[in-house]
Amino acid sequence: MSDIETLKAEIKKLSAKSVNAKMNLHDLSEDLPTNWQSILEVAQETYNTFKTLEDARKKLKELEAGAAA
């Protein structure tokens, strides 16, 4: 499996993980003020997940651009 294919598979997993993180944050916001103490933890997890996904997408673009050259 090439680096590009491996990264695409990773992005697919990260995308699913990011949707789950987004829903966790959404669910938490709907239940406020219950569990307000977990806002920072859930928000940080969501941020980290989306940051990792964005970084992987940038790397994929770079790899694809390099492969096309």
UniProtKB/Swiss-Prot annotation:
Q: Which UniProt keywords apply?
A: Nitrogen fixation
Entries under Gene3D superfamilies matching the protein: Helix hairpin bin (1.10.287.660)
Pfam families reported for this sequence: Rop-like
Question: What InterPro entries does this protein's entry cite?
Answer: Helix_hairpin_bin_sf, Put_N_fixation
Query: Is Ribonucleoprotein given among the entry's keywords?
Result: no
Superkingdom of the source?
Bacteria
One biological process term in Gene Ontology = nitrogen fixation
Give the family per the record.
Answer: Belongs to the UPF0437 family.
Q: What is this protein called?
A: UPF0437 protein AZC_3451
Query: Which organism is this protein's natural source?
Result: Azorhizobium caulinodans (strain ATCC 43989 / DSM 5975 / JCM 20966 / LMG 6465 / NBRC 14845 / NCIMB 13405 / ORS 571)
